[in-house]
């Protein structure tokens, strides 16, 4: 119950400004990371820090991904939450991060949610892309697509766009899906992988046995 109450008050915690109506993001992002990112968007919007927060988080994400020791430190379950929160606050202030960014890091540390930082950052990026009229699309395939396949897929995906929206595609290779592809575009998710079909058929056979 306490964690739910903290999330309900997240926007006010992130923002030092007086309580105002929540600023709704242009796209809904699900999960715990989505709730943190949505609250961050609302707080940063009120403080006119949307772009600065995205810049801060992008730089921080790149640093953590490239620095193994820092990554282990940030996600360590051993370090005291208050010590971690204080250290992050001091470091982010030295780096001149926006107040909304500083408060987010402190809150994640206080709540023991720093392991979620990478996914929170990705969720915030998704919201900001929608804010700019970009539709983020991730395509997962078993092997890299050639130029012709990529062009055909891009043409098909553009049919989902509306008005002045632009498409931003990221590709990822995951051999475990065997074949086919998995596409997430905006808030839509389509799994056309062979691995999922095999699992479906296996489940049907086991149920019928």
From Swiss-Prot:
Disulfide bonds: none annotated. GO terms for molecular function: proton-transporting ATP synthase activity, rotational mechanism. Pfam families: OSCP. Keywords: ATP synthesis, Hydrogen ion transport, Ion transport, Membrane, Mitochondrion, Mitochondrion inner membrane, Transit peptide, Transport. It is found in: Mitochondrion; Mitochondrion inner membrane. InterPro entries: ATP_synth_OSCP/delta_N_sf, ATPase_OSCP/dsu. Gene3D superfamilies: N-terminal domain of the delta subunit of the F1F0-ATP synthase. The keyword Transport applies. GO terms for biological process: proton motive force-driven mitochondrial ATP synthesis; proton transmembrane transport. NCBIfam families: ATP_synt_delta. Mitochondrial membrane ATP synthase (F(1)F(0) ATP synthase or Complex V) produces ATP from ADP in the presence of a proton gradient across the membrane which is generated by electron transport complexes of the respiratory chain. F-type ATPases consist of two structural domains, F(1) - containing the extramembraneous catalytic core and F(0) - containing the membrane proton channel, linked together by a central stalk and a peripheral stalk. During catalysis, ATP synthesis in the catalytic domain of F(1) is coupled via a rotary mechanism of the central stalk subunits to proton translocation. This is ATP synthase subunit O, mitochondrial. The gene is ATPsynO.
């Amino acid at each position: 119950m306490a964690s739910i109450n903290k999330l309900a008050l997240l926007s006010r915690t992130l923002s030092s400004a007086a309580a105002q109506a929540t600023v709704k993001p242009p796209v809904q992002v699900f999960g715990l990371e989505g709730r943190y990112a949505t609250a961050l968007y609302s707080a940063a919007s009120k403080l006119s820090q949307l772009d600065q927060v995205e810049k801060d988080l992008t730089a921080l994400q790149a640093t953590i991904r490239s620095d193994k020791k820092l990554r282990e430190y940030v996600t360590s379950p051993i370090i005291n939450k208050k010590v971690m929160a204080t250290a992050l606050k001091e470091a982010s202030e030295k780096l001149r991060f926006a107040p909304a960014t500083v408060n987010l890091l402190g809150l994640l540390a206080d709540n023991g949610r720093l392991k979620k930082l990478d996914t929170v950052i990705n969720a915030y990026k998704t919201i900001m892309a929608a804010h700019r009229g970009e539709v983020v699309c991730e395509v997962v395939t078993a092997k890299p697509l050639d130029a012709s396949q990529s062009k055909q897929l891009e043409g098909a995906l553009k049919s989902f766009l509306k008005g002045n929206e632009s498409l931003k595609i990221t590709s990822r290779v995951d051999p475990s899906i065997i074949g086919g592809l998995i596409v997430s575009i905006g808030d839509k998710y389509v799994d056309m992988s062979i691995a999922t079909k095999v699992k479906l058929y296996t489940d049907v056979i086991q149920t019928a046995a």
